[in-house]
Curated annotation (Swiss-Prot):
PROSITE patterns named in the record: DILUTE (PS51126), IQ (PS50096), MYOSIN_MOTOR (PS51456), SH3_LIKE (PS51844)
Binding site for ATP: G164, E165, S166, G167, A168, G169, K170, T171
Region annotated Non alpha-helical, tail domain, chain positions: 1080-1554
Ranges where the Dilute domain occurs: 1205-1480
Keywords: Actin-binding, ATP-binding, Cell cycle, Coiled coil, Motor protein, Myosin, Nucleotide-binding, Protein transport, Repeat, Transport
The name this protein goes by in its record: Myosin-2
InterPro entries for the chain: Dilute_dom, Fungal_Myo2/2A_CBD, Kinesin_motor_dom_sf, Myosin_head_motor_dom-like, Myosin_N, MYSc_Myo5, P-loop_NTPase
GO BP terms in the entry: actin filament organization; protein transport
Species of provenance: Lachancea kluyveri (strain ATCC 58438 / CBS 3082 / BCRC 21498 / NBRC 1685 / JCM 7257 / NCYC 543 / NRRL Y-12651)
Amino acid sequence: MSYEVGTRCWYPDKQQGWIGGEITKHTNLSNKHQLELTLEDNQIVEIESETLDETKDDRLPLLRNPPILEATEDLTSLSYLNEPAVLHAIKARYAQLNIYTYSGIVLIATNPFDRVEQLYSQDMIQAYAGKRRGELEPHLFAIAEEAYRLMKNDKQNQTIVVSGESGAGKTVSAKYIMRYFASVEQNNEENAHHNLEMSETEKKILATNPIMEAFGNAKTTRNDNSSRFGKYLEILFDKEISIIGARIRTYLLERSRLVFQPKSERNYHIFYQLLAGLTNEEKSQLKLTGVEDYHYMNQGGEAQIKGIDDAEEYQTTVEALSLVGISKDTQYQLFKILAALLHIGNVEIKKTRNDASLSSDEPNLAIACELLGIDSFNFAKWITKKQINTRSEKIVSNLNYNQALVARDSVAKFIYSALFEWLVDNINTVLCNPEVASEINSFIGVLDIYGFEHFEKNSFEQFCINYANEKLQQEFNQHVFKLEQEEYVKEEIEWSFIEFNDNQPCIDLIENKLGILSLLDEESRLPAGSDETWTQKLYQTLDKPPTNTVFSKPRFGQTKFVVSHYALDVSYDVEGFIEKNRDTVSDGHLEVLKASTNETLLSILETLDKHAAKLAEKEQVNKKPGPARMVNRKPTLGSIFKQSLIELMGTINSTNVHYIRCIKPNEVKEAWVFDNLMVLSQLRACGVLETIRISCAGFPSRWTYNEFVLRYHILIPSEHWSKMFSSDTTEEDIRDLCRTILGAIVEDKQKYQLGNTKIFFKAGMLAYLEKLRSDRLHNSSVLIQKKVKAVYYRKKYLAIISSIRNFHSRSEGFLTRQRVDLEFKTQAAILIQSMVRSTSTRNKTISLLSAITRLQSLVRKQLAQKELLQRRQRDAAVSIQKKIRAFEPRQSFNTTRRSTVVVQSLVRKKFAQKKLKDLKTEAKSVNHLKEVSYKLENKVIQLTESLAEKVKENKGMTARIQELQQSLNESANIKELLNSQKDEHSKVLQQQKDAHDVQFNEVQEKLVNAKKEVEEAKEEIEQLIAKQDELKAEVRTKIEELNKAKKTFTEFQTQNSDLKNEVKSLKDEIARLQAAVRSGVTSSTITSTPTASRRFSAHSSVADGTSPRQLNVISMNNGGIEDDARSTASALSQINDELYKLLEDTKSLNTEIVEGLLKGFKIPETGVAVELTRKEVLYPARILIIVLSDMWRLGLTKQSESFLAEVLSTIQKLVTNLKGDDMILHGAFWLTNVRELYSFVVFAQESILNDDSYNNGLNEDEYKEYVTLVTELKDDFESLSYNIYNIWLKKLQKDLERKAISAVVMSQSLPGFIAPESSPFLPKLFSQSSHYKMDDILTFFNNIYWSMKTYHVETEVFREVIMTLLKYVDAICFNDLIMRRNFLSWKRGLQLNYNVTRLEEWCKSHQLPEGTECLQHMLQASKLLQLKKANLEDINIIWEICSSLKPAQIQKLISQYAVADYEVPIPQEILNFVADRVKKESSLSSDGKSQTHSSDIFLSVDSGPFEDPFGQIETREFGKIEAYIPAWLNLPITRRVVELVTQHVTVQESQRTE
C-alpha cells in the first residue's frame, strides 16, 4: 500500500462514520512508519505503524479512490473497495439526484423521500426497453428489463428480490417493477405506441397494489406506508411472453397491529379510509363515527398522514376491489366485518377481583355481533371463559381481566388475518384461474419482503423477519460466490477458493430439531406453556457448544436471549412469543363465528379451513416414517412461517435471481438528506459490504483488452503501439500489447490475470494504474511545456534584439526628417499669414457692398408686393360678388326642375302599379307574358334614363359646391399672405413703422370685410350641402323603388323561363310517347325518365361546376324556336337516360374506379424542375366529383352512398399501406385530392342550403334527404382528411425516427472536431459509423417540400407538417442524447450544433424562420456541452443560456458530461451545487411542496393524434371543372360518363345561349 505525502484516504469518525483526509507527512524511523494525516475538518491525526498494509494494522487509514471514480455507477469498479469508498460513492451519487447505484449484481436504491415520478414515466420505460444492463444509467427498470429478457431468451423463470428496512422504499420499487412488466410488452410490439391502453389482466395485476396496501400497510415511525407483511408476486407469462395472470403469496402479516399501535403510528390504512370515504348513510348503517372513538385506532394519536387524502385512497381501493372481481355487495359485507372489528375493540370488560365479566347487552358488543351475524351471548361468554378438553370431559373456567382482553383481541386478530387471506385467495382466483394456470409458460417473481430489523425491544415479529433475512442472505452470498466463480471459469483464469462468512450456524440455531423454533412449538403446544419456561429451555439447550457461538443470554435478566445474525447481534424479549406463536382463537369463539348468518364471514372461514387442510396434507407428505401419531396437532404460526419460507427459498433457488437493496437515507424522512451512520448500518445489514468483500477476495476489477489498451497504452513507449492504428490490427495484437504494458509496469504477477476476453485485477490495482497514468501525463505535459516555452522565449529574445536595432536606425532618420520638416513649415506659415490677411480684408469689403445691395432690393420688393396685393384683393372681391349673385337663380331653377321630375316619376309609378295588377291577371298566357316582358324592358330603360338625369344634376351641384369651397380657400390664402407680409415689414423696415401702421390699418379693415364675406359664403355652402343631402335621400328612395320594380320584372322572367322549359319538356314527352305507341314499345323502358328530368333542374349547375345564373327572357318571333327546343330537350333526355344506366350499375363502376383509378394510377413525378397543373394532380378527385354530382342530379342517392363508402375506404387503405419511398409522394398526393373532394362537398352543401334555384323540382322529403346526405358526406370527408393526415404524419415520424438520431446525434460532419466513437485500435472490427447523415435528413425534408408544393397542397398545411416534424426531431434526439453515457463532450456539442444549424438554414431558405424555435432544446444542449463548467459563475451562465431546458435536464446533461483526458474533471462541489439548485428551483416552482423532479427529464414526444390543419383554412373555390382523364388510364365506363356529362353541359350551355 502507498501512503506517500498527498495521498487521499479515509479515517474513522464517530459523527460521520468516515471522514476524508490527506497524508501531509510520512517518516520512517526505527522500522516504524509515522504518518501525519490532516482531516477535512482541519484536525491533525498522527499514526505510528510497523507496516503499511491496512489489512494487518487497523489503525492505518483506508485509501481513497481517484476523484474520477468516486461517483461511479458500479461500486465494483472502484479501485479501493472498502467501506468508506462504498459509502462515499452512494452519497456522491445521491447528492447529484441519482438514487440508483450498482454493486455488482445488486442494485442499491436510496429513497429520495421526494416525488420522482419522472423516473418511472412511460418515456423512461421506453428508454430502458430492449437495452442491456450497463448501456444506460443504473435504474430499477434496468433490472426489470434484464429479468424480462433472460426469461424471454433463456426460457428461465426469474425472481427479483426487493429488500430493505421499513421506509427504504421497497413497496414503491416493487410497484414500479410491476408497472414496467405491464408496459414493456407494448413497447416491444411492432408499430405499438407507449400510450396504448393496458390489457384487462395487466390492469388487474396493478390493481392488487392499492388493495394490498390498504389491508396490509400502515403508518409507522419510520415509514408512512410501511408493509406489515411479506409478499411474493408471480407475474405469469404464456408461450408468447404475454402477461396472462399473476399469483400472490403473503408472509407473516403483523396481526398485533390491529389491536395495538405505538405512539405516532396508525392501524392498517383501510380503517381510516373507511371512516373518510363512506357516506354518512353508510356510516350510520355501520354505526361508525370518528377515529378518536375507537380503541383500535386512537392509541397512536396520529389519525392523518401528511399529504394523503384517505377519502381519495378509499375510492382507489374500492375501484381496485371492483377491478379484481369483488362486487359492491361483497365489498359492503367486508366493510361490515371491518366495522365490527372496530366495535369489538371498544367492548368494555368489567374487572373483578379474580375474574372478568361481560354482559351480552354491552352496546359495542351488540353492534359487533349484529354486523357479524353471530350470537352475542355466546360470543360474550367465550371472551370471559375458557374451555379445556380432556379425554373424558370438558372443563370451563373463568378468565381474569387481562386474559379476557387477550381473548377479545385474539378473536379480532383472527378475523382480520382470515379476511386478509381471503382477499389474497380471491385475487389469486381471479388472476390465476384454471384456464390461466394451464397456459403458464414462465413467470417473473417480485419479492417485497421486510429487511433486517432491530429495535430497543425486539419480539416474535422481528425474530421471524430476521430469520427470513438470514435465509435470503445465505442464498445471496451463495449466488454471488457462484457468479464470481462462473466468471473465472468462463475466462479460464487461475483462481483459488474465496472464503466468505457463512451464516449456516445461525440458520441451524433457528431451524434444527432442538433449535429455537422447535423449542418454541413444543412449549406452545403445552397448555401451561409460558415465555419464562421456554426461555429456560433455550438457555439449557443452546447456550453451550456449538450453538453458543451464535446464541447467548444477556448479562442481566432472564427474559431475553441474543442471536448473532449476519448483520449484528440482536437481543429478543421473550414476552409474548408463546401467545403470538400459538395464534389461536378459542374453540368456543370459532363455533360462534361458524354459526354466523353473514355469508361473507362464512366464506372467509371456509378459505381459512381450506388453507389449514392443505398445510396438514403437506405436513403429512413431508412427515418422516415412524410410529403413527394419535393426534393431529394444529400448526403454529412459527411452523407455518418456516414452511412457507422453505417453499419460498425453493422457488427462488429454481429461478434466476436479481437483487434490489433499498436504503433509507435518514430517519426523519427529509428529502435528499443523507445520514452516513444510518446508511452505513443498512449497508452492513443488507449484505452489500459482504458482497464487496467477496469480490475483493478475488478480482473485483475487470476490463476488456480493448478498453485497457485505449486507456493505458501511453504507459509504454510509442514504438510498441504506434503500429496498432493500422487497419490490419487483430485481437491477438491487442492482447500482446496488453501483456507488454502489464509486464512493463506491474511487477507482481499475482495482481492480475489475463482471461479470454477480459483482464482481471486485484483490489487497488486500478488506482495504481491511474496514478502511473496521471504521472505519465503530468511528466509529458511538463516536458512539452518546457520545449514549447524554450522555443517561445528564444523567438521572443531574437525579436527584441531585432526590434532594438530597427529602433536605432529609425530614430535617427526620424530626427533628421523632423528638422527639415520644421524649416519647410516655417516658410509655409509666413506665406499663409500673408494670404489670410489679404483674404480677410477682401471679404469684409465684399460683405459691405453686398449688404447695401440687399437692403435696396428688399425695399423695392416690399413696394412691389404691396401693389400686387391690392390688385389681387380687388379681383377676388369682384369674383366673389359675381358667383354669389349667380347662385340664387341657378338654385331656383334646379329646384323647379327636380320637383317636376319627381312628380313625373310618381305619376309614372302609379300607372306602373296599375299596369302591374293587370299584368298579374294576364300572367297565365304565355304570349301575353312576352308582350309584358317587352313593355317592362322599355319601362326599365325609361327609368334608367331618368336616373341618369338625376345623377347628372347631382354632379352639377357637387361641382358648384367645389367652386365655392375653392373661393373660400383663396380668401384663407389671402389672410395668410397678409400675415406673412406683416412679419416681414416688422423685421426689415422698422424705421418706417409709423407710415406703415396707417396702411396696415386700412388693409386690416379690408381683411375684416373679407372675413365677413367668407362667413356668409360658408353659411350659404352649408345650406347647399343640406339641400344636397335631401336630394340624395330622394334619389335613394327612387333607386329603391326602381330596384323593387326590377326584382318584380326578374320574377316574371324566371316564371316565364320555367313555364317555357315545362312546356318544352311536356311537348317532347308527348312526342316520345306518341312515337313509342306507334312503334309498339312498352312503357316500362322509360320509367326512369320523369325522375331524371325532375332531378335535372336541381343539380345541373353542380354537374358543370358553375354557379346558377338568371337569364333574361326576350320575346322572339322566330317560327323555328319550338322545333329547336324539342330537339334540345330530346338530346338532354337521351344523355340522361344513358348516364342513368351507367351510374345505376354501381358494381361495375365501383370496380373500375377502385381498381383502375385509385389502385392503378401513377403518381405524377415531382422535383425542382417539375411544374404540374391542378388538372394533372387533382384528376382523381375531379373524376369522382363529376360522377358524384351526376348521381345526385339523376336522383341516385343510395347508389352514391355505397359508391362513396367504397372510395373512402379504399383511399384510407392506400394511405395506411404506404411504405418506403412511396410514402411521401403518395401521402401528399392523396392529401390534396381528399381536400379537393371535401371542398366540393362543402360547396354542394352551401349551394343546396343557400340557393333556392338548386331545389326546384324537389319536394320536402327529397330536400331533407339531400341535405342529410351532403351533411353526412361532409363529416365523412372531414374524418377521412383527419385520418389520412394523421396516418401520413405518423408514417413520416416513424421513417424520420430511423434516421434522425443517427444523422443529428451520431453523425460528425464537421471536420477537425471528430470525437472518437470507439477505440482507435481495431478500426475494422470495432468501428461504428452512423448509418444516416444530415444530407439524408435534408433530403427527407426536401422531398416533403417539393411533393406538397408540386401537388398544390396549401402553404399553411406544409408549415404545420414541417413544424410538427421538427419538434419531433428535437424531442427524440434530445431524449436519446440525455440518456447517453460516455458520449457527451465538447466536440459532440460542436457537431450537434453544426447539424442542427443545417436544419435551421434549411428552414430559413424555405421561408420557415419559426423552425428555429422547434429546435431550441437541441441547440441549447449543444451549447451547454461547449460551455465551461469549472466554477459557479460558469454554471450561472449555462442557466441563462439554456432557458428552454428544465433544471433537471441541465443537471442531467452536466452529470453525464464525459471529461476528456486533457480536460479538468468537473469538481464534485460544482455537481452538488447544480443538484442543489435543481432542488431549490423545483421547490420554489411547486409552492413549497417537495417536488424536486416535478418535471420529466424527457421531452414530450408528440406522436398524435394531430389536429388537421385543413380545418383552420378556407376550403378551395370551385369554378368550372375541366374533365380530364389521362390517356394511360383504362377506364371505359368512367370515360363514357365524363363524355356524356360534357355533352350534357354543352347542350345546356347552348340552350342558355338561345
